[in-house]
Structures are given as C-alpha cells and as structure tokens.
C-alpha cells in the first residue's frame, strides 16, 4: 500500500484498469467522465509552450556556438526522416503480408460518411504548404496561446540565439529564464499528481462510448498494429539504443511512468514535460533535448507512421480496391510528407490519414468510416510508440554529438543513481568573463 502511494505508474495503471471496468459495466457513466481526461491534458498542455521556450532558450544560450545549434537541428531532422521512413515501410510490409482487411468486401457507397465529415474537412487544411507556412507564427503571443510547438520552438531558437550573441548583456535574462524553467517543472510535479484521475476518466470514456464489442469487430487490424508497433520498438529502437550502449528494456523501465500516463490519456503530448526532464537526468545534453524532443512531436511520430500505412492498405483491402506496387510506393511518398503534419494529440493520426487518402485518390475516403470506432483503441499504441521514439531520438542525437554521458546513463538505468540528482553534464553556469559567450 505504501508503494502504491509513492509510485505514480502504479497509480496510473490501477486507474486505467478501474476506468476500463467502469466504462464496460456502466457505459453511460463512463462516457460522462470524459472531462476528467480532457482536463488533465489541458493542464499539461498549458505548460508545454513555456517549458519548451525555457528549455530551448537556456540550452542554446549556454551552448554559445550557433553553428552547433544548426548542426544538432539538422542531425535531428535526418534521424527523424530515416526512422519515420522505416516505420512507414514496416507498416506497408505488414499490411501486405497480414492483409487485415481481406475478405470484408465492403461497398464504399454503403458507408455513412457524415461521421467522418469533420475529419475530411479538417484534412483539407493540412496540406504540405500550409504546414510549412504554419511554422512561422502570426505573432508570438498567438503561438503561445495556441500552444503550437513548432511555432514556439522557432521563436525559442531565435530568442536563444540572440541571447548568445548578446554575451554578458544577456546574462540577467538568461538567469531569469533559467529560474522560470525550475518553477515550471515544479508545477509539472503538482499537475502529475492528477495523472491517475485523468487516466481513469479517459479510459472510462473510451470503453464506455465505443465498447468492447467494437474492439473485437476489427481485432485483426488492431492486433496487427499493436504487434507491428512492438516489433518496431524492440528491433529498430532497440538497435539504436544498443548503438548508444544502453539497454532498451532498462530504458523502458526508466520511462514507465510516462508510458502509463500516455496509456491512460492516449496523447504522447501529455508526457512531454516529464520526458524532457527525464532525458536530461539520463545524461543527454540539455540543448539536444530542448531541440530534439519538441521537434520530434511533429517530425518523429513513429507510431503514427506505422498506423498510416497499415490503415491505408487496410481500407484498400476492405473495399476491394486493387493497389499495385507502384501505387504503394506513391502512398509511401505521399505519407513522407503528410505524416510530418500529424499532431501528437489524440485524433491527429486520423486527420492525417484523411489527408493522405484525399491526396492518393484511388482509395475511397469513405473507408475511414470503418476505422472510426476502433481508431481510439489504436491511439494508445500510437502515442506510446511516439513517446518512446522521441526519447530514443534525444539519446541517439546526444550520442551522435558526443554529448551523451554514457556512464551516467547506464548508472541511472541500472538504478544506482537517484533520479532526483541533477545530471552531471549540467553544472551551475560559472560567471562569464568579459567578451566570452554564454556557455554552461
């Protein structure tokens, strides 16, 4: 009982189980508990923009070398492109081999498209050009108010670069932002005490509204997706961590609290603040974490990438739409663009899938109606895979930059270093002599 009182992940796990039971036994009550999950996610999202700002600004300003900032960003984008391409390809291969939609013989004309109208209409506004232009905020206040991670990240990089260029004159501002970061993460600690409540409400709503019967009706597709996501984590991400000299299973145990929070809320964004702090404590470079993790929430959605190719071919198979190998490669090419616009929030993958089907053309968009009921049950695996992928990305880019404290990382994963201890590569910044840059 004492362990339950101290352990967040056990509390969240218990809340998820209880939420599923309430949703199954009392569907109407479960469906009415949605505000608990939504409220928790809103509390976390309230903190994401200022945390990204504070972390990125202090990281870049202390780094001093602006060429290094560009190098880290480019390495991060290259890593994201390779891993998400592999994830898309794996989803495509599994869909071809397992054929989860074969034999359903669905006539697209008989499907009710009213329920998916909001997704298809929203997808029209998520084109590649719109996405790229949206990285530039209309104004800074608007970016922070809406919590747009990429817009906040762009402003934060510019702000941090300006602080580094100001050198000594920027020291008071840097110290203020550094202190702000400590306050924000303390607030995160307060908010995370409500994680079990949010997980309970979100799970009760999911099971209460959609029911176990919906889950069983498309069991083959769900099983394929969960198995493929697990395979990607174990093989691909495990291989990356092995290159970094770390154990995948110890890494997963280290981030178990974040995994269970995401499991309960179906949103990898709900664990972003905790994940950034965990990666710093693991021994990753703070500037790398500040750049890579926020960018990853738009460019490194491995779980969503697997889902997109798997779901696209599932709809084609279910509606008896013949897709040639050339067309599959075209789908892959389209998804290389549209998947980068998938938000790390619940439902983002579904909207991106609608955009992809619209762009491809030969697969009926009406087929989305087949997924509407079960999509929510697959969002947990999407979000967890996205979370793990972004954590591994920060480790990999830190290792690539030569700024991963491997000895500390192994000790932390082995449990021989208390998590409360600040990372060894983040000492208190010394006084900066005249004419020097703002190095940490």
Curated annotation (Swiss-Prot):
Cellular component annotations (GO), alphabetically ordered: plasma membrane
Entry membrane topology: Multi-pass membrane protein
Domain of life (superkingdom): Bacteria
Any one GO molecular function term: fumarate transmembrane transporter activity
One of the protein's GO biological processes: L-aspartate transmembrane transport
Chief site of localization: membrane
Lineage, broadest ranks: Bacteria, Pseudomonadati, Myxococcota, Myxococcia, Myxococcales
Protein name from the UniProt record: C4-dicarboxylate transport protein
UniProt similarity note: Belongs to the dicarboxylate/amino acid:cation symporter (DAACS) (TC 2.A.23) family.
Compartments reported by the entry: Cell inner membrane
């Amino acid at each position: 009982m004492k362990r339950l009182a101290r352990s967040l992940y056990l509390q969240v796990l218990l809340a998820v189980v209880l939420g599923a039971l309430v949703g199954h036994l009392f569907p109407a009550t479960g469906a009415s508990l949605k505000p608990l999950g939504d409220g928790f996610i809103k509390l976390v999202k309230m903190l994401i923009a200022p945390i990204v700002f504070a972390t990125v600004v202090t990281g870049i300003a202390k780094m001093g070398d602006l060429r290094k900032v560009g190098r880290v960003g480019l390495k991060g984008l290259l890593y994201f492109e390779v891993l998400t391409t592999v994830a898309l390809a794996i989803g495509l291969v599994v869909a071809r081999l397992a054929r989860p939609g074969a034999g359903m013989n669905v006539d697209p004309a008989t499907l009710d498209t009213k329920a998916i109208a909001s997704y298809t209409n929203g997808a029209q506004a998520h084109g590649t050009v719109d996405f790229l232009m949206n990285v530039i905020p209309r104004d800074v206040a608007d970016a922070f108010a809406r919590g747009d991670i990429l817009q906040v990240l762009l402003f934060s990089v510019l702000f941090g670069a300006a602080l580094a260029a100001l050198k000594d004159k920027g020291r008071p501002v840097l110290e203020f932002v550094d202190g702000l970061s400590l306050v924000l993460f303390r607030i995160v600690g307060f908010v995370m005490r409500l994680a079990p409540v949010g997980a309970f409400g979100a799970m009760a709503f999911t099971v209460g509204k959609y029911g176990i019967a919906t889950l069983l009706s498309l069991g083959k597709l769900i099983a394929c997706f969960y198995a493929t996501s697990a395979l990607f984590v174990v093989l691909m991400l495990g291989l990356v961590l092995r290159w970094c000299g770390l154990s995948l299973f110890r890494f997963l145990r280290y981030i178990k609290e974040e995994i269970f929070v995401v499991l309960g809320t179906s949103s990898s964004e709900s664990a972003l603040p905790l994940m950034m702090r965990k990666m710093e404590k693991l021994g990753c470079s703070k500037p790398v974490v500040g750049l890579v993790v926020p960018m990853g929430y738009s460019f490194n959605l491995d779980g969503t990438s697997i889902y997109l190719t798997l779901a696209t071919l599932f709809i084609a198979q279910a509606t008896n739409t013949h897709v040639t190998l050339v067309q599959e490669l075209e789908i892959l090419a389209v998804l290389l663009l549209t998947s980068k616009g998938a938000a790390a929030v619940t439902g983002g993958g579904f909207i991106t899938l609608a955009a992809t089907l619209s762009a491809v053309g030969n697969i009926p968009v009406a087929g989305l109606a087949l997924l509407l009921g079960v999509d929510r049950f697959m969002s947990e695996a999407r979000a967890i895979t996205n979370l793990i992928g972004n954590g591994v990305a920060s480790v990999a880019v830190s290792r690539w930059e030569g700024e991963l404290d491997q000895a500390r990382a192994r000790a932390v994963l082995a449990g021989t270093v208390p998590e409360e201890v600040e990372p060894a590569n983040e000492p208190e910044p010394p006084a900066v002599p005249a004419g020097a840059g703002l190095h940490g």
